[in-house]
Amino acid sequence: MADDGTIPVEPRVLSIQSHVVHGYVGNRSAVFPMQLLGLEVDVLNTVHFSNHTGYKKFRGERMTSEQLENVVAGLEENDLLHYTHLLTGYVGNPALLRAITDTLRKLRRQNPSSLYVCDPVMGDDGKLYVPPELGTSIIVSLSMLIFSHPCAVDIYRDEVLPLADIITPNQFECELLSDMTLTSDADAIAACRKLHALGPRIVVVSSFTPPKEPHRLWLYASQAVGQGLSNTFKMEVPRLPAYYSGTGDLFAALLLSWLTRHPSNLKLALETVVATVQAVMRRTNDAQSANRTFVRTYERTTTSFTPSYWYVGELKLIQSRRDIEFPTAAHQPEGAAALVAAGVTVVFLTDDKDDVVRYTLSSPDVILS
């Protein structure tokens, strides 16, 4: 595919993740933006819920591995497995996760260059969505994403990542997969390098909060360049005073979309993704600031789960369609200044013999060149 913003080969994405009737998480958050950006998207839903689980109640059904295999068999029988991309988010159980790896192998028999973008959803904020000691029990979490078995970490690490081209873990998921604690740039580089060694050529840590600076939010991106080395940079993103389910799903879908247009320019793609997500979140925050809804969820302590209250708001995705189609980002003349004005900064990190050298570029023309 060309790297000039054109798409000479029609991309077709198979998106396997959650679905809700009301709201925007999982496929509901991912499919619309990909279609707006010119991608054909086929959808396979791992759950079908009334709403995301941040609400006080939800109902619905979960897909089994047998059901997924049956659907994929139907596609295969009709010679419909010609996909250029596979995108996965929330999966739900180890058997289903393994069935997805089998599906990817079938896709690559049809198209060996099929690109796999994996969001390895397992937890956030220092905890699994379901704690290991509860086995297959279910705890209501703020996120749509509920994981139900501790061995998921091993399956992702040993079976999924070797097949993935791009992964988008959050800080906690990156720590689980790399078996490291992230506290610094050096830690992030080392963790990304460990994940590169497992298979993915691009690792994007979609959120990182410095231990002593909880008000700051960073994104790390690393691209393997061979011989155990990688090019790494980070972006500081403004933290809004609200939590919106579905932003991670939106992020991964946008990254897939913009890397389709710019496969050789990770920095440009990510700048565009961040600008878009920020625009959607700001539009959502502005629209809902006068009508906030708080719901009861549960936070885990060292010995139990205690109730807490979070603001739950649905992304204004439809209202943000022009922000998605025509993002103010690096590829537009006014994009550099707008991104900097929004508070986004870019820092390039390089490593030489395990030493970290930081280059902070303050000029918009340099940052986004």
Predicted feature descriptions by range:
Residues V237-L255:
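Short glycine/threonine-rich catalytic loop with a Thr-x-Gly-x-Asp
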Residues G60-E76:
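Glycine-rich, highly charged phosphate/nucleotide-binding loops
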Residues K267-S369:
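Charged C-terminal helix
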Residues A95-K106, H215-W218:
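Short Gly/Thr/Asp-enriched flexible loops that form oxyanion-binding sites at enzyme active sites
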Residues H82-N93, D119:
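Short acidic, glycine-rich surface-loop motifs adjacent to enzyme active sites
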Residues P131-T232, L240, L259-K267, A275-T276:
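Conserved phosphate/ATP/ADP-binding segment of small-molecule kinases
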Residues M1-M63, Y311, K316-A337, A342-T345, ...:
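Glycine-rich phosphate/adenosyl-contacting loop at the front of the ribokinase-like
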Residues L107-Y116, L198-R201:
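A short helix->loop->beta-strand "cap" motif at the edges of active sites that frequently abuts
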